[in-house]
Amino acid sequence: MLSYRHGFHAGNFADVFKHFILVYLLNHLKTKKPFTFIDPFAGAGTYSFDDKFMQKNKEYLTGISKVLNTKINDPYINDYLNLIHLVNNNKKISIYPGAAQFALLALEKKDTIYLNELHSSEYFNLKKNFESNSNVKIENKDAYSNLTKMIASSKGQKLVLIDPSYEIKDDFNKVLNTLTILNAKFENLTAIIWYPVLNVEKN
């Protein structure tokens, strides 16, 4: 797991789908105050197209690049795209936001954003990118053991994005067990689960 870098996949077709859903739910739920967004697998939180990880496989070419080059007349998709243009100051797209960046752009300063990342290098980048924001709290712990603590310390409506690397086979069981615990312990909680189907027959 600690060899994983989300930059390899940033902006690919799966990221586009995941972040479109995230932006839709952020806009829908943020009207319920107080509001907290929690990302226990935050990565670096934002990604440069010039970064060596994004350039290795260039997965963004079949993801966000295709979307940006397609004429789309849908208000919900435009909400997602507008945030990408916003972080790029409406200039040439050179930055693709991670979930943390999308949340920061979509939410208000009175909303709270909890970010967690175990990978030391990614955590360093996450802090560098977001620690100047007073409504963002950043931790460097095991995501599964820390998630319930982050939720318990939050007030009001909560949105959680559970998006592990799945490089460790046990991640599948850990996600399901985590959902069971969250469902039993917490109210006013919505969870987005990234759960790749790698083997159709098995899953």
Which residues are covered by each model-predicted region?
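Class I S-adenosyl-L-methionine-dependent methyltransferase catalytic core
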Residues: 1-203
